[in-house]
Amino acid sequence: MDQNANQKKRFFKDELESSIETTLTDKSSFLFEPQVDAIQEENANDPEEQIAQGTQESPFIEQLRAVLPTIRLEVALALEEKYRDIDDGLDLAISEYFDQYQTGNDDAPPSSLELQHSQEVLTVPDNEEKDTDLQLVSVKRKREDDFMQSSQSKKPQRANSSWKKFVGSLQVTVMVTRPTMRPVPYGTPLIFKRSNNNVPLKKIYEQLNKKKTGLAAFVKIYSANDEREIGRVPEDIARIVFPLLHRNEVHFKLTMIYPGDKRLSIGDNIIIQMDSFLTSTLFNRKENPTFSTQNGNGRERFGAIVETEQELEERNIRMGLIMLFDKIKLRPVKDEAKFLEKLKQDGDDNEIVDLEDDESFGNFLSQEPLNDELPTQHQEDTMNINQLTSFYKATQSSKQLNSLIPTTPPPELVKVELRKYQKQGLTWMLRREGISIGHDNEDKSEDDTTLLNPLWRQFQWPRNMSWHNQSTGSENDNSNPKLIFFYGNLHTGEFSLERPTMNSFKNGGILSDEMGLGKTISALSLVLMRPKDEHTTSQSLFHQESSNLSSDDVIEIKEPERSYAYKTTLIIVPMSLLTQWRDEFDKVNNNAGLTCELYYGGNVSSLKSLLIKRKNPPTVVLTTYGIVQNEWTKLSKDGTNIRSLGRTSGIFSIEFFRIILDEGHTIRNKSTITSKAVLELSSKYRWILTGTPIINRLDDLYSLVKFLKLEPWSQIGYWKQFITNPFEERNFKQAFDVVNAIMEPVLLRRTKQMKDTDGNPLVQLPPKEIVIEKLQLSKKQKLIYEEFLQRAEKTFRSGLQSGDLLKKYSTILVHILRLRQVCCDSNLIGTLDENDEDLSSGNNKLITESVDVKTLIPDTEEEEDEVPPFENDELDKLIESVEAKFIDSNQLIPVECSICTAEPIESSSAVVTECEHVFCKECLEEYGNFQKEKSLQQKCPNCRRDINLNRCLAFEKGSDGILKLIHFDRKERPAKLNALIRHLQQLQDSSAGEQVVVFSQFSSYLDILESQLNEVYSSNKLKVYKFDGRLSLKERTAVLEDFKVKDYAVQKVLLLSLKAGGVGLNLTCASYAFMMDPWWSPSMEDQAIDRIHRIGQTNSVKVIRFVIDGSIEEKMLRIQDRKRTLGEAMDTDEDERRKRRIEEIQMLFES
């Protein structure tokens, strides 16, 4: 007993020390009899007991136990007897152990996972009697046998496959784990085996995620002939193979390639060829009840969603297929026609991918995908507007556009002549409503019933390059040799041999032509070509005989949910465009029987009566987003149910024949009342007109998709799963692939740069010149600017040093806003910028905080001139003399400025010196400043007498229209105002009656400009119009109509807010524009300029942008240039947008 006590223990648990009780007696031994009949027989002749009583283990057995600590003693003795006298006997013994005694997995060396499982099963309390140890071993074996049987019974049966088809080959390096007594020849067939089937799948992947184990431990290579283990594959291959071995959906054929002429030892590397085949089982999953292609939601556990075992398996099968396709370079086909043409020219040239050829494989990975191919792997890049180019290109390929045969509307319907691309667009729009144009060679490629479902990818069956086919020249895959393509949905794991097409959608779309290409004319042409539903008549709606209807039909007609206005198209537009659309309708329509009605301002008491009860209802009803929103809000407050909308009389009581949304991106934010209201409107056909379907976020498209009722994408769950979530996870390519596939059939976009079939631009526009004019701040502006700049830099540096720049975000933006305002006019300080989302909420008190500009100017500032102004009697005497000399019949007599020689001088800009000589104000001030810089006394240019600008007179027209003289107030005008006045004067001199548009993002600045221009110019020389969001519809209409009328005697200037001017206005009557201040986004300014430079413009367009030299405006231009080069960022969320804005702010404060 003492000897036993000193013997080295072989187990970590005391209770296991005497638990191995088996016998080794000829045919009753474990080698020949797997089932032990009686524990008592084991105890009687237990070799373990014999060793415990005094026999020492041999060195061979000790070495064997060191490698295989759980090997049974009788097995170890038998292996010792067989191999102890042979060279490499230990390696051969280990190999035979795994070949012969591991088949039932009873004695296999447990992985870390099995050890944990075994320890749990074998753990017993310390106070258990020792005679239970023997029972424990037998019980443990029985449990393992039962577990194996039950797990085998639970596994789904491997479905029989009727055929398999080759998809690709890999050459894989395998590490040898078992030695061989003889070489494994070249061409020897090998097989995969999944070991440790008794370990739960979930536990395997949990350990894999924790990086405690790899799947390579569970995937082994065996000889196909004698099922002898050879080695293990690399981890990346194991991750592909492990989930796919469980089912007969993917078949692998393995062949020994190298070395083939020598015995293998543990640790050697060999090369095998892995040929991959897809089987018929993969394409018949719907017939296999054990597999679900639906994305389950898992089971709920304590309120959380837990992935089921089956869902885990299906997910990893999908991942295995994706990784396999990547490895074998099986890429989706993007353009089937182009691919087939290329295939015909080049033939099929598949290759075997050698994963060990680092150089060739590295070159493959670095290759750019072909134009007709898309890599399966998701590429993550910075998301910007440049990536939107691919989105737009998907809808504007030359092949697609050129295939559209022009449709010319009859002249009795459409008064104007459409351009060729507009006629092609009309063809496309009619097709989108399911109307056959009747062309003999009509291209049916646009039919979305043949378009591939966007969740699916098309793959080509490659030529069979398997080892068996290359060696025998026989395919032998029992598949249809005529098959060229197969289709896979890598999101759900479904595969099909038939093309999965989209559900037929023929009820509208998105016309997304670039601004200025005439979307309005195109839409109205569609309305005039097809003004009503041809398949519906008033008689069929209201006077059908009940005998011809089923009972269900009669009930449906008796109580309709909404009345069908089958002759009316509803067009919803921004308020500023309401009258413009009405004018365009009158301009285009040549059929007196088709009319247009405005639905605005309560002019229609009952829209339902107008559209349903009248024999000839209006063809078009024009209304605004505001009217739709107001009606919806009222119905919501009244508690009106959607089902009972038919009982109301407004816009929601009707199902329209067609609804058209102009500037459709207005509904992009699905949470706004406007968007919710528009989505509740009812119609048979739905159209969206927008030049910018995406503005800030990819989700901008969702409301458009929901309005168009594109199923299943209009369901928020689908949209989030396949677009929003990948986008937020920065899988931009995946999100855009799906979006492109969704939008391609329903969106048409043309740009001004595109060319027609003859190589000419779609539209010939006159040239456009944009000039940046840099100005210097006035002295007063400069003092104020420097003060605000110091404050802004102090706040920025403080936030940068403390690391809380985002916390000071709003404060910094206010400082920047004030700097921009000072560059325009210091009187702007304290007003809002309605275009800035971060400052337009009105919650920021810093914006509206009053600032006394006078306190910012140093007290030490000396008066420019110490000469006192006039005394009262002096002023009166001078006024009396000048009036008699220069005013006749309430007009300033013609007089020439001797400085600039301009004649006559405008009374509003004339200044009279004390010596009674008249000059232009700008000329005299410039002359005075020059004299002062030279430290010379200011003298009259005419008589050379000493003069002082503080002692001069100016002309002013009172409210009664009488011209009078007043003391000249020599306050300094802001730099931009002076520059604008100078350019307007030059235009008056060179181009009489020229109409001018002045843009600014500050509505308050427009007020200042209006006041200042009216002070400088008389009404008979210059007329100022102002157009911003504060005007009513009537006022807007009057402003635009009056401005568009050319008057050669009066110069017309339209002051336009950037926000109002960026939407739909047609201002081709003007050819000059001035941008008074820059904005962060260059696209917003481009939209405004396109109001002038668009179809209908006959003159060259010149745009002058005023920028203060060396100011924050100059740096804003650099940000604009950067955005034009790199693309404007699209943000995933609010935080992302703020971070990008902070980057821009940092650029502003860079030296």
UniProtKB/Swiss-Prot annotation:
Q: Residue ranges of the RING-type zinc fingers? A: 897-944
Query: Which residues lie in Acidic residues bias regions?
Result: 39-49
Q: Where does ATP bind?
A: D513, E514, M515, G516, L517, G518, K519, T520
Q: Name one GO cellular component term.
A: nucleus
The keyword Hydrolase is annotated on this UniProt entry: yes
Where would I find the Helicase ATP-binding domain in this sequence? 500-711
Q: Where is the Helicase C-terminal domain?
A: 979-1146
Record has Zinc-finger as a keyword: yes
E.C. no: 3.6.4.-
Using the UniProt annotation, give all residue ranges assigned to the region (Disordered). Answer: 35-54, 142-161
- What residue range is the signal peptide? none
- At the top level, the lineage of the source is Eukaryota
Q: Which InterPro entries match?
A: Helicase_ATP-bd, Helicase_C-like, HIRAN, P-loop_NTPase, SNF2-like_sf, SNF2/RAD54-like_C, SNF2_N, SNF2_RAD54_helicase_TF
Give its localization.
Answer: Cytoplasm; Nucleus
Which GO BP terms, alphabetically?
Answer: double-strand break repair; error-free postreplication DNA repair; error-free translesion synthesis; error-prone translesion synthesis; free ubiquitin chain polymerization; protein polyubiquitination
One Pfam entry name: Helicase_C
Which SMART domains does UniProt cross-reference here? DEXDc, HELICc, HIRAN, RING
**Function, in words:** Probable helicase, member of the UBC2/RAD6 epistasis group. Functions with DNA repair protein RAD18 in error-free postreplication DNA repair. Involved in the maintenance of wild-type rates of instability of simple repetitive sequences such as poly(GT) repeats. Seems to be involved in maintaining a balance which acts in favor of error-prone non-homologous joining during DNA double-strand breaks repairs.
* Family membership: Belongs to the SNF2/RAD54 helicase family.
Report what the protein is called.
DNA repair protein RAD5
Origin organism is: Candida glabrata (strain ATCC 2001 / BCRC 20586 / JCM 3761 / NBRC 0622 / NRRL Y-65 / CBS 138)
